[in-house]
Amino acid sequence: MDSIVNVVEDDVKYAQRVTSFSSPQNANVKVFTIPRHSFTAFRLSYVSPTELSACSQVTLLGGIPKQWYADQNNQVWKLLTKISLRKVRKQSDMLRRYGYGTIYKKRVGKIPTALYLRKHFTWSYEDNTSIHNGHRLKEAEMEMKRTRSSPVQKSEYKLSLPRRCRSSSDQNFMRQELLKEKKSELSRNNSLPLIDTAQAVDIHPVLHEEDQENTNKRNKSLLSNLKRKDLGESKSISRKDYSHFDRIPSPSSARSVGETDFNYNREPSEDTLRYPDSIIEVTNRTSPAPNSILSRSGQFVNSNDLSDGFSTSNTINNVGLNANEKIFFNALQSMEKENLMLWKTSQKYGTYLDERRKSADAFQKRERGSCVDIGKLHSSHLPFINILPPWPTELTEEERIIHDRLASKHSHHIRKHVHNARNKTSCKIKDSVGTFLGMTNSLTNKATVKKRTGQILKKEKMLVMVKEAIQNKVPLPNFSENECFDTRVSERWKEYIVIARSTGRFDPPILLQFYRHRHIPEIEDISSIATKYHRNPLDFFLSRNCIVKFYSSLDKTISIQKPDKRLGGFIDESIEKKDELKHYSPIKIFILRCSSIRSSGRWYKFLLESLDRQLFTPAINLKIPLTEISIKINLNEIIFQKLIDLGKQEKDRLKICFLQRGYKIFQHPILRYFTVAILEKLKLAHYDYLIRKWDTENPVLGCALKRYDRLEWIPCDEDSLVTGIFAFCQSHLIQYRPIANRLRETKSLEGKCLKEPTPIEGFLIRLTDKYGSARTNFGKYSISTAYFFTCENLLFSMKAYRANPPLPIDSMIDDTSTEIEKEEIWKQWKKIPEVYEQQPYPLDTNDHIEWMNCQTTQSEYDSRDFYAFHCFHRRIDQILKTDNVIDLTEVKDIYQGTRTDYEADKIKYGVYKEASEIFWHRNYEIDDVSRSVINIETSNGLLLKLLATSATVAEEWVIKLKQMISYWKNKQREDTERLLKIRRSNAGLLMLNGEEETKIGENTLRWIVEHGRADEQTFNANGISLSRPLIQKGPLYQKPHKHSVFSKYYVVLISGFIVLFHCFHRSTTGFAKEVLEYAHYVTIPIDDCYLYSGTTTELDLLQRDRTFDEINYGSHALPRVYGDGWRSVEDESSRCFTLWFGTRRALSSNRLQKKGNEKQYTQDYGRQDNNIDPPSAPEADLNNSNVPSNTDKIHFTKKLGVSGKSMVFMARSRQERDLWVMSIYYELERLRRTASTSNSRNQTM
């Protein structure tokens, strides 16, 4: 197993191991890194570049109308719409915060503006991805391509030793730069190339202003000597030999040095320390001037990703020098390597190295002399290291001042370390003495040991329901939502802050408390907890005779069976027959609904470990679906900890291997360990075809949890992997398989292969109302401007003013854009063709993203990455703002107007002509207007008429929409057939009839659950990969409260919201009327809700259809048949899920008084911690970015310990219910992680 760990740690070995078939045996491996917290890195962790490019492409038809541009600049109209659309704007801002905080882990104030993207956009890397000789271009070839394809000219470059390598006394003198002057323009976009991990790249620091002046003087004198040497003695050396100098990075080649506030006291990056002796031919790369990473705006750049030094070894080997010059530069290299090591040591212990100072002083004396010709230098003149006696060197006055400043700067950290060491020592003494005196038990779990009595071990806000058994008094190990004994509800769903406190005893180890208020002390006296007046009657001690299980494997609800406290020790089921039990009370069942699946896994693991029931197992069984075999992988604690530590080192950068075709993503070390171990096992089992298939197709591999016919994909981060593997291994089967995204092709009834069309968007003039009438009730023509766009099988429409069309990266505007900028950008909009394709991820012939390769600079990557995020967010934001939607599978026909149509009603088409001229600011003929009409006929016989900008655009709309209708009708039929096929296959394989198949639940035998087949396309990974704007869609039945009636809605799930559309339009008398489209009903934010499903939803349902069934006792299901052939006989509870929202109340936030009260409460009851209730993602960002100055401002908070509001949704079948629940849980998981990240950041600020 250690050899596998070595392969995982070595990037080159791992890349060669997983690409053994597709790559040549001795091929050079090129590995580079990108920021992990970026939109591109997040999506590449789940999808291939081909799928990513196809999902991101959008086509704009018709261009940008002049009237829309005028409306955007109309301040009066903007003010009126701002007031009327304040709710929509608020939801749009929430969506913006959701997406940015989830992907980039930053606050809202850091979101880049359109001006930033236009400013930092440089050029596209066109024809710049062909790589030779170990993935690098030849110098001459690369230079020609740079000159031909880039408008950026080369700038001045310098060579400098790292600032951190020098002592404080000679920082102004210990610099040797080599400068070659070139007459070229200064580029503001040259930046650092993406960091190479297989061969590390070191980055030089930016010099101070006074250091820069001294450096320039020395550069001129040194350059004059070099020129004289070159002209006088080295005429034989051609100019080509010195062509490498222009690629040596310079700290001042991009901008002035005063613009950057750089931290020189920071340690070097991991790549620099890991590869201090690496030599990289940076001459084959783009000029790495650090203007983007160290820029003032800094929206994307994380300074922790930088290395403070620039290695001279990166360029010296490529410079044509004579023998004496090479001796000089070799000395510089050796000094730099020693300085790097000595600087690391000095930073650790806070001392100055006198050996380094003496050698530096010796070198300074030679430098301060008259300009010595480099060619005349001899090895005897170079600096050497002196061996000094072991007493301290006397410091000069300047050195003493610097030393005192550094000492005062780090004194706080020193005192902190001393305090922590003292606390650790005192804790060890207390534990040793307590164990010796018998005050503690050595068998106490790790979760509760070394904790004071009454100290908080774990805390979270969650939903709680309490049930009580009617007769049973002994907990059962197989208790689940399919309850095996009769129970009644004693406490309905209520939200509490659940606190787990240490008792300091072996049994019970912890105390669970349910708080109704937020003033919670960190340490509380629990000796007299039963007599306290503010005690919640739900509080109980978690004794070792309690049983902790998952109540539901779908929503991961936890159940705790608590027997009577008078029953001590472990209870056997046979005790139930004894007469003594009749004096005890029945058991209580506490059902805990955490905010996310990851949180449920953590609490489940914590509760079991508190009861000394460990979940960690050294042997993990992974099922390989394509082989129908299971592989046991040994993962002991030592190896597991190594992988966790390696994952922490890679938490900020994502490694990517540049293959001949596509990329190979370096996932979390745990997944890499699984990959190498499984490949070894498959080789031994002679499954070479599977290894070759994975190698040639290059899929993204991951883990999934399977239970019967349901697949639950585990996100590829550390917390989700650990929770999913160890917490859910008892209830689910762990599979290792390629991450499946939704296929982009289908087959027609004739067997023809159909490809998914590209989504289209554009401005159109609507000529009919929702009833298909061309005139209103008052006789006027129904004419309105609208913006239509497609997303999968849905055609959305909104008012034209709300639209946000796809624009190039250098033509973007937002609310911060000025009038002058808008006028300049409008000139660019005029040049946009009638058919414009927006593609943030263009691919070359080798499936490589054109702008993401080894030559991509950091600023270029940042601007391109956020542009891709903006494109994806723009599409979701438009769905949030939409007014109506048309299901294209319900469209009967689409056709274009003809020239003869206007003859029937010339007046009407004359009005259409005037409307087109006003909106598009063009001149039209009547026959052109008639050919620009798009007719959409729905299945209910109504006709929708749309007017395009020209006949050509109308024809393009008709062709694209017909392709979409044909594709999505066949795709919908194929999805339904796939569900039916899987259900019939499982019923036949397990010999189950229809009634038995619908009763598959928590108490089903494990062999039945494991042998069930699941379809990866039905339960695809779209929910965790964000490959498409629509996470889930389809018809659902919904009711707002218990005693209302279910109504049918078309529901769309997007990032952070659930959008409901009316399926019917009813008259005043209640009759349904035929309409063209589904109208928007309500938008529900899901960031602050709880989701539960299964039998727990029975509390929200009415008891109906309770007729006695003589054939199936206890069954109250009603058989149903749908138009697409699907049949269902499940109960209502198995088809329903509920969204629970807490009740809010208004509170006065006089924070000064509140803080004073909390301070007094802390003095009385111990240290106060009010961060138990972490705000949601939008609330946290809003509270941080817009802190009000008025302390008496009213704010809203949720009540605790009270019933909330619930919205019940019902699907057609259990399979569809599972799809919706898993999709919502994926999104809730992402939102909860964003909220916790924002809350932890607020605590540190």
Swiss-Prot record:
Molecular-function annotations in GO: protein-membrane adaptor activity
Pfam families for this protein: PH_4 (PF15404), PH_SPO71 (PF23207), Spo7_2_N (PF15407)
Region feature Disordered, mapped onto this chain: 207-270, 1154-1192
Transmembrane segments: none
Bias (Polar residues): 1159-1173, 1182-1191
UniProt motif PxP: location: 385-399
Domain PH: 1030-1229
Membrane topology: Peripheral membrane protein
Assigned keywords, A-Z: Membrane, Sporulation
GO BP annotations, alphabetical order: ascospore-type prospore membrane formation; protein localization to prospore membrane
Phenotype reported upon loss of the gene: Abnormal prospore membrane formation. Abolishes localization of VPS13 to the prospore membrane. Accumulation of vesicles within the prospore membrane lumen and reduction of phosphatidylinositol in the membrane. Abnormal spore wall formation; the first three layers are synthesized but abnormally deposited and the dityrosine layer is missing. Sporulation specific septins are mislocalized.
One Gene Ontology CC term in the entry: prospore membrane
Known partners and oligomeric status: Interacts (via PxP motif) with VPS13 (via SHR-BD domain); during prospore membrane formation.
Record's function text: Recruits the lipid transfer protein VPS13 to the prospore membrane during sporulation, thereby aiding prospore membrane formation.
Record protein name field: Prospore membrane adapter protein SPO71
